[in-house]
C-alpha cells in the first residue's frame, strides 16, 4: 500500500521495482513493474569493477528535509574511503579481525557508513541485522547476536537502548548470554539521556560513548577517540571534537560565545574528508543552506555549548530553541 502511494506521488517513477518477498507476509505485486528478488537474481553474473576517480560520487542520500525540502547529499569516493577507514581504528578502536555491529537501517547514513562502507573498507566483519531491539522476538535479541557472533562493539541509537530498558529494566535477558567479547557501546542519532547511559554502564560494566554526527558529515564530528586516547565521560555531552573538525559556538550576530554559553554550533571551514562536497543538482542551495548564515563556517543547525574542558553539549536543533524572557532554552535542557 505504502509503495503504491509513494509511486503515485513520485515525479520520477521507476520503471521496475525489485521486491524481496517474506514467506509470512507476502506483498501484492504489480506485474507491470514488480519483479521478485529471486527472479531478478536468476541468470545474474558477476560484474567487473568500474574504475572511478576519487572525486566521483559514491551515492546520493536524501535527508529528511529538517531545514526545508529534502536534500540529496552526495559523497566523493576518495575522501569517503580515507575518513571512514581512519575512524574504525581511531574512534571505535576496531581491528581488522574484530566483529563490528551497527544496528541501524541500511538506508540511513549510519547504515551506509557503518554497516557497509567503513567496516568493509577496513577489512573487519560487519553484522547486518533485520529486526528490532524488542519484539523480534524479545528484548534479548541484541545480546543474543552479540554473544553468538562475538561482537566487539555495538553502534545503535539511544532509542533502541531505551526500548530494551523499558522491556527488561533489570537486564534479565542480558544475564543469559556470554558477552565476554563485548567491549563498548556507541550511541548516535539523537541525544542520549544520562539515565539510559548509566543504566547500560551498570548492567554491562562497559563504556558508553555518546557521539554526534550528521547525514551531511557521514562520520563523527565529536566523539571519544577510543583508539587514540579516551577521556572521562560527562553525562549529557557528546565528548570532544574529532581531529579534522574545528568547532565554535556563535550567537545570532555571528560572535563566538564563552564556555558554557548556548548558541549555534558551527564548524570552521574547510570541512574534513568524507563530508559532503555539495548537494545533488543544487550547488547554490548547498552554499545558501549551509555556508551563508555564518561566512567561513558550516552551519550544523544544532544548538548547544562547549564547556571549559572542551566537551561539546548538543542540546537541540536550532529551530527547537525556545526564547523565554530573553533566555535561550533548549529542549534537551528542559527534558533534564
Over which residues does each language-model region extend?
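Conserved ATP/PPi-binding loop(s) of AMP-dependent carboxylate-activating enzymes
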Residues: 240-244, 255-290, 329-331
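Gly/Ser/Thr-rich phosphate-binding loop
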Residues: 124, 152-156, 165-232, 246
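AMP-binding/adenylate-forming catalytic core of the ANL superfamily
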Residues: 3, 147, 154, 271-272, ...
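Conserved S/T- and glycine-rich ATP-binding loop of Class I adenylate-forming
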Residues: 57, 63-66, 88, 100, ...
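Conserved AMP-binding/adenylation subdomain of ANL enzymes
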Residues: 81-99, 109-153, 166-172
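Structural core segment of the AMP-binding/adenylate-forming
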Residues: 3-39, 157-158
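Conserved pre-ATP/AMP-binding loop-to-beta segment of ANL
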Residues: 15-19, 30-62, 69, 84, ...
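Active-site glycine-centered loops adjacent to acidic/histidine catalytic or metal-binding residues
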Residues: 105, 189, 213, 239, ...
Amino acid at each position: 500500500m505504502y509503495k503504491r502511494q509513494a509511486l503515485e506521488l513520485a515525479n520520477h517513477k521507476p520503471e521496475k521495482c525489485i521486491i524481496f518477498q517474506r514467506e509470512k507476509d507476502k506483498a501484492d505485486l504489480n506485474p507491470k513493474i514488480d519483479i521478485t528478488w529471486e527472479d531478478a537474481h536468476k541468470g545474474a553474473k558477476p560484474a567487473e569493477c568500474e574504475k572511478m576517480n576519487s572525486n566521483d560520487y559514491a551515492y546520493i542520500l536524501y535527508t529528511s528535509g529538517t531545514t526545508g525540502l529534502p536534500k540529496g547529499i552526495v559523497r566523493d569516493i576518495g575522501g569517503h574511503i580515507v575518513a571512514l577507514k581512519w575512524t574504525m581504528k581511531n574512534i571505535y578502536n576496531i581491528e581488522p579481525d574484530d566483529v563490528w555491529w551497527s544496528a541501524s537501517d541500511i538506508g540511513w547514513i549510519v547504515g551506509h557508513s557503518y554497516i557497509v562502507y567503513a567496516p568493509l573498507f577496513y577489512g573487519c566483519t560487519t553484522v547486518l541485522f533485520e529486526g528490532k531491539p524488542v519484539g523480534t522476538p524479545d528484548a534479548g535479541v541484541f545480546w543474543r547476536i552479540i554473544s553468538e557472533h562475538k561482537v566487539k562493539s555495538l553502534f545503535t541509537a539511544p532509542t533502541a537502548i531505551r526500548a530494551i530498558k523499558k522491556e527488561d529494566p533489570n537486564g534479565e535477558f542480558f544475564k543469559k548470554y556470554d558477552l565476554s567479547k563485548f567491549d563498548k557501546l556507541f550511541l548516535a542519532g539523537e541525544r542520549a539521556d544520562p539515565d539510559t547511559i548509566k543504566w547500560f554502564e551498570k548492567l554491562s560494566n562497559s563504556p558508553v560513548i555518546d557521539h554526534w554526527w550528521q547525514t551531511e558529515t557521514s562520520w563523527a564530528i565529536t566523539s571519544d577517540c577510543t583508539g587514540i586516547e579516551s577521556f572521562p565521560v560527562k553525562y549529557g555531552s557528546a565528548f570532544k571534537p574529532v581531529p579534522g573538525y574545528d568547532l565554535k559556538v556563535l550567537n545570532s550576530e555571528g560572535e563566538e560565545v564563552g564556555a558554557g554559553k548556548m548558541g549555534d554550533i558551527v564548524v570552521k571551514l574547510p570541512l574534513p574528508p568524507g563530508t559532503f562536497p555539495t548537494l545533488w543538482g543544487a550547488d547554490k542551495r548547498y552554499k545558501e543552506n549551509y555556508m551563508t548564515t555564518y561566512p567561513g563556517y558550516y552551519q550544523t543547525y544544532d544548538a548547544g555549548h562547549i564547556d571549559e574542558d572542551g566537551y561539546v553539549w548538543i542540546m537541540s536543533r536550532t529551530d527547537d530553541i525556545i526564547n523565554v524572557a530573553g533566555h535561550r532554552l533548549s529542549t534537551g535542557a528542559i527534558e533534564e
